[in-house]
């Protein structure tokens, strides 16, 4: 494993500025790691020529002495982000061969800050999944293993490639997106830090849409400080996205003091689930004690509508997806099915979508179309929207009562084996989002921080939920938790 590729963003920034290393050396080290890690299935489109050109430009900026924090930092980009001239398929066969003519706002801001793109990362198809098993490229694999077993484990989803690449030190950090937990759950499964910002903090323009009222881009990094640095480059108002907030972007890194004395941390009783593993329960209690020892006040809180969050999410998200995915018709871009003589436009739509969309995407399109249909709109979709408003109100009331952040588990288990859920009811897979979906429904910021290992040696994470637009405060609380937890474990290299 290259010493350079295992650097954090902050450490690499300091070495680059001190001229101890060059962006080109750092990029070459990461490209070599990517080249040797095919077994992880993390990178699906490599861009070495682009990376070298960007690194050269970064070195010139560094020499001139006015380089931003992200200058020369090699990243992986989730395949959901449109990257100009580089395949951007959302891990779906229906977008086979699609190379956008434009750059997403988030990636263009990262590149403007001098970041280097090593390539595109694996994910669940259209970000629909919790295990990276719905990808047209095949599975991404978790670099961690259970004890002495060689069972291939999931890196989580949908940002599974991002999680795997960062945990295996193939890149210094990666972009992710989070619709119901797709940054936080994989981050917890691989022992890295993942931040879902407040809805509207990062532009959605140029990110392939899943559920437009829930999707949000965020950083997946090796520690909390790196999350703060990378979020600063990703965030900001974008007139091309009507949901993007016209708010200044603070210096998130400068807010990392680690001082949380007097902060009130809420512990929601509704997150104590039946059948929750004892290890998760114990980790949660330990995390609460760590924050209390750091000077925070713990307060038991209630979020009474939590139990309705998953059903509401799995009505709203597929409904929005069925609308968004209607644009994939074989006419404008991507895959078009071969037609038989006499086939008309209806057959073209049917065959193209049958060939192009995977089973999970088809399932969600059908659920979404069903809940939006005339006879069921009020019974399902409208009711789910009302539940969403109640969930948001629960959080508003807790924050209004003086709570600064809420501590919960990030996931209901450690990483499971690839294929282990295949025979299960799809709802079993959906339960992976049980601790994370409320954050998306309420539009709040949430961060997963690695906090320990289970008895099989797999990472477990805790989640902190913050007030809207107060990512700096949330990151500082996460920083205090990270320091107290002292998580430094790395996977043993087998790939």
Swiss-Prot record:
Keyword terms, alphabetized: ATP-binding, Ligase, Nucleotide-binding, Protein biosynthesis
Protein's GO biological process: translation
Assembly and interaction partners: Heterotrimer of A, B and C subunits.
Record's keyword annotation contains ATP-binding: yes
One example GO MF annotation: ATP binding
Species this chain originates from: Dinoroseobacter shibae (strain DSM 16493 / NCIMB 14021 / DFL 12)
UniProt protein name: Glutamyl-tRNA(Gln) amidotransferase subunit A
Gene3D superfamilies given in the database record: Amidase signature (AS) domain
One cellular component (GO) term of this entry: glutamyl-tRNA(Gln) amidotransferase complex
Family from the record: Belongs to the amidase family. GatA subfamily.
Gene symbol of the encoding locus: gatA
Residue ranges of coiled coil: none
